[in-house]
Curated annotation (Swiss-Prot):
One of its GO terms (molecular function) is structural constituent of ribosome. Pfam families: Ribosomal_S11. The keyword Kinase does not apply. Belongs to the universal ribosomal protein uS11 family. Keywords: Ribonucleoprotein, Ribosomal protein. Residues 143-152 have a biased composition (Basic residues). This is Small ribosomal subunit protein uS11B. GO terms for biological process: ribosomal small subunit assembly; translation. One of its GO terms (cellular component) is cytosolic small ribosomal subunit. The gene is RpS14b. It comes from Anopheles gambiae. Residues 131-152 are annotated as: Disordered. It comes from the Eukaryota.
Length: 152
């Protein structure tokens, strides 16, 4: 005999607040970590400590084709989604931490970095500090490509 389905519990949506100390019209900061490689763009918003994730959207979540994941358009859509979620939770301003792949790979941010930053600024979020946090090696492991490098 199949179990009865009468005692289903309705899931309640938890409303996250930033505490009672936030006054109306006060600027509340979050940290937007933008990781822009040449394959994808991540827009990840946390609280100021960086421990609590508020929202994380990637370019691959916004477009269907794999080749478009790192495009400026996908990054713009991802940033708009993140900004909307931040506003609903009461975050009005963002510090930006921009990151490229780094290490022994490229230190140049991908094509989505600029458009993600612009989309955050245009969606009425105040921008605090902008910082480049690309990992730069003090001494690196050997880069791939062999002795004579990548031949085109």
């Amino acid at each position: 005999m199949a179990p009865s389905r009468k005692n289903k519990v309705a899931k309640e949506e938890v409303q996250v607040s930033l505490g009672p100390q936030v006054r109306d019209g006060e600027v509340v900061f979050g940290v937007a970590h933008i990781y822009a490689s040449f394959n994808d763009t991540f827009v990840h918003v946390t609280d100021l400590s960086g421990k609590e994730t508020i929202s994380r959207v990637t370019g691959g979540m916004k477009v269907k084709a794999d080749r478009d994941e790192a495009s400026p358009y996908a990054a713009m859509l991802a940033a708009q989604d993140v900004a909307e979620k931040c506003k609903s939770l009461g975050i009005t301003a963002l510090h930006i931490k921009l990151r490229a792949t780094g290490g022994n790979r490229t230190k140049t941010p991908g094509p989505g970095a600029q458009s993600a930053l612009r989309a955050l600024a245009r969606s009425s979020m105040k921008i605090g500090r902008i910082e480049d946090v690309t990992p730069i090696p003090s001494d690196s492991t050997r880069r791939k490509g062999g002795r004579r490098g990548r031949r085109l």
